[in-house]
Amino acid sequence: MEGGRGVTRVLLVDDSPVDRRVVQLLLSSSACAGSFHVIAVDSAKKAMEFLGLKEEGKEQAIDMVLTDYCMPEMTGYELLKAIKALSPLKPIPVIVMSSENEPQRISRCMNAGAEDFIVKPLQSKDVQRLRKCSPANTQCCDAGSDGKPPLLLLPSDHVVVDATAASPPPPPSRRRAHFAGVAMVLHSSSVELSHYFPFLFKFILLVYAILCLGELLHRWSNGCFLNLWCA
């Protein structure tokens, strides 16, 4: 089900506030031109409640689920299986994210029905992959449709490799991926703060002028100013 005027409603599921903020900033940026409407929750259980998968006959309110893999209580993989099992008539596209590029984890999710697997942090080049997995786009991956092992797009270098490849590339550092996400948030904040720099500079000059005037008045009252002028 596609939102009005071509807007894809995305349910973002991630227990990390930083990672949620990164995705929200990216999908709400001018580059996306209003293509996405993001609804964020911090757990898989809240996602289940929002989707109404526990209530028979309740209509879906979103077009796509973008979920983290590692979460407490209920993982993204378990959420993926629940969505695919409980909504067979109206399948919801599910994209899994993880800060670890592990081929076994990717293969596990793809075999469970995930439309894609993206390594964190989400980047602008990944937006097109989300568009391809939109219900209105028929180009989304159809894993195993030809009876062959699914081809996985490893998000670290965006090179298509076979899931059975023997020599996978080394996984990126989870800490490095987290820092990259923090850096994206800080960059966005710095852009917003840059508009206030001229006002801050004028305020500092005004304070400095007031301090100088106060010092002159203090010297005048003590007679120091006249002595300095006569000398």
Swiss-Prot record:
Organism, scientific name: Oryza sativa subsp. indica
GO biological process annotation, one example: adventitious root development
Family: Belongs to the ARR family. Type-A subfamily.
Function field: Functions as a response regulator involved in His-to-Asp phosphorelay signal transduction system. Phosphorylation of the Asp residue in the receiver domain activates the ability of the protein to promote the transcription of target genes. Type-A response regulators seem to act as negative regulators of the cytokinin signaling.
Pfam families referenced in this protein's UniProt entry, alphabetically: Response_reg
Name of protein: Two-component response regulator ORR1
Annotated ranges, domain Response regulatory: 9-135
Coiled coil location: none
